[in-house]
Structure formats: structure tokens, C-alpha cells
């Protein structure tokens, strides 16, 4: 694992290359990620950096959270996240310090994790890309129905995991191997090629690509 950043999805736009090619990009706003705790093998059984970002009203922060943030000397954020790290990555990091957008550079590949948009209860055609049945030729009221879900007396059941209608979206999704087009450290912006999960304004986690 490696140190990443927590940011907010701003939306999509496009940028142009020197040759005039249009590239679809997503803009991620990265406020300072404040380190709230350094976890080590000796004290916690694993190595990680815990961070927070953004702000939260004082009335929304519990007494335990206030003590945790005060111990690190940072403002209360809208949540806490952890990144598993190696000993080398822990060097120079301490509670109270900050990690900014310049952690990444243009051309670097990243993995982006977010909460996908919820679509509610959907049928097999929309949820799993099933084919529709005949529109005519004797078919009635079954145009978007799944059809058979199994065999016969043997095995006499529907196997677990069978694709069926149900809740679609609102799940943790990671898109791998996206390219960082540009980084604006002053404004705290990451411009990433392609689409990333979630709605505008949602929290996203940006990490160095695990497959790079």
C-alpha cells in the first residue's frame, strides 16, 4: 500500500493537448489532509497513517473525537481515513503535519475509490445488461423479465449469486489506472483523465496505482 489523498469530486470537463485532442477529465479538490495519528507495529499491530480533511461543526464532534483531534493538534475534519504504509513511507511523517495535492505529479497513474451513485431497485436489463425478450410474437407482459433462473429437479434450487433484480449502485467502487493530467498545488486541484465513481461533491480516495 502507499500514502494517498482524500479529496472531493468537483465534476467533469475537458482539456486539450498541444495537438488539439480533447481529453475528458475529472477535477478533484484536495484540501490539506491533516495527519491525526501514526500507527506502528509496536502500538497497533500494523503500520498506517490516519488523516482527516475538511471541517465539521463543533456540535457535530463527539467528546472522544475532540480529544483525538486535539492530541494531534489538528482541526476536527469530516471523517478519518487510513493508508497502510511501509517504514520508509513513515519517515518524516508525524501527527499534525499535512499532505497536499503535490503528493502526485502529472503523468502518474492512480487508483480512485468512491461511493457510486445509487440507482435504487432495478431490473436485470438495467442492472446486469440482460437482453430483452421478444416485443411481439406472442410475448405479453414479459418483455423485460429475466426468464429461467435455473434448471429442473436437479439441482432443484437457484444458485447463490444468480444475477437478478435488486439494489443497484451506492457501493464502494475503485477505478484503476487513471492518469493524472495536471496538478495545481496552490489551488489544491488534481485533474484526472476519465471518469471516477460517485456524485459531484462526494469524497474520493486517490492512491498511487497498485498496477503501475
UniProtKB/Swiss-Prot annotation:
Report keywords, A-Z: Methylation, Ribonucleoprotein, Ribosomal protein, RNA-binding, rRNA-binding
Record GO terms (molecular function):
rRNA binding; structural constituent of ribosome
Name one cellular component (GO) term.
cytosolic large ribosomal subunit
Record-level GO BP terms: translation
- Region (Disordered) residue spans: 147-166
Q: Which SUPFAM superfamilies match?
A: Translation proteins
InterPro entries annotated for this entry?
A: Ribosomal_uL3, Ribosomal_uL3_bac/org-type, Ribosomal_uL3_CS, Transl_B-barrel_sf
Note one Pfam family from the annotation. Ribosomal_L3
Q: How is it modified after translation?
A: Methylated by PrmB.
Superkingdom assignment: Bacteria
Q: Which residues carry this modification: N5-methylglutamine?
A: 153
Quaternary structure?
Part of the 50S ribosomal subunit. Forms a cluster with proteins L14 and L19.
Stated family: Belongs to the universal ribosomal protein uL3 family.
Summarize the protein's role: One of the primary rRNA binding proteins, it binds directly near the 3'-end of the 23S rRNA, where it nucleates assembly of the 50S subunit.
Official protein name in the record: Large ribosomal subunit protein uL3
Organism, per UniProt? Psychrobacter sp. (strain PRwf-1)
Its taxonomic placement starts with: Bacteria, Pseudomonadati, Pseudomonadota, Gammaproteobacteria, Moraxellales
